[in-house]
């Protein structure tokens, strides 16, 4: 099994975006089980001081031993099928943990970006981090359905 964690800066509480992200993470866990993908978890962290450097300090302990994908506006934008294939390759290459990072309002600290194995973007636009986590969870769910042959994804 390849555990997938969406690691985010900031807590959404009961916001509708948080519920949407949790719903898609749950669906991804259920759909990915037979594919050795998951569980898919969302972990929220908060820094005690403001700023990207302080956020980096609370993110860093969660990265050890993981394949790290930083969500950043300058990262690679994946088409859904290619993203599904990429997740399958990460699993097949023996990665036991993949951590997707979503920074706070100012993005991720350069030291975290440098430590990441890769960066990915949700297109050329900038998205609020609350929406980004829901979009990422949905894409992980979509990837699991693509890999399982489910009709959820349509080209």
Curated annotation (Swiss-Prot):
Keywords recorded for this protein, A-Z: Cytoplasm, Methyltransferase, rRNA processing, S-adenosyl-L-methionine, Transferase
Pfam families: SPOUT_MTase (PF02590)
MF GO annotations: rRNA (pseudouridine-N3-)-methyltransferase activity
Binding site for S-adenosyl-L-methionine: 103
Compartment list: Cytoplasm
Family indicated by similarity: Belongs to the RNA methyltransferase RlmH family.
Protein's name in the database: Ribosomal RNA large subunit methyltransferase H
Taxonomic source organism: Caulobacter vibrioides (strain ATCC 19089 / CIP 103742 / CB 15)
């Amino acid at each position: 099994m390849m555990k997938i964690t969406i690691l985010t800066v900031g807590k959404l509480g009961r916001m509708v975006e948080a519920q949407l992200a949790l719903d898609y993470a749950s669906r991804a866990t259920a759909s990915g089980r037979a594919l050795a993908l998951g569980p898919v978890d969302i972990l929220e962290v908060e820094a005690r001081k403001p700023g990207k450097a302080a956020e980096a300090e609370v993110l860093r302990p969660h990265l050890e031993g993981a394949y790290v994908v930083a969500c950043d506006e300058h990262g690679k934008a994946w088409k859904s099928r290619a993203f599904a294939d990429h997740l399958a390759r990460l699993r097949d290459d023996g990665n036991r943990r993949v951590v997707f990072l979503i920074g706070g309002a100012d993005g991720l600290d350069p030291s975290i970006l440098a430590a990441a194995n890769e960066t990915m973007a949700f297109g050329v636009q900038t998205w609020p981090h609350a929406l980004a986590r829901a979009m990422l969870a949905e894409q992980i769910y979509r990837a699991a359905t693509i890999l399982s042959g489910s009709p959820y994804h349509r080209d």
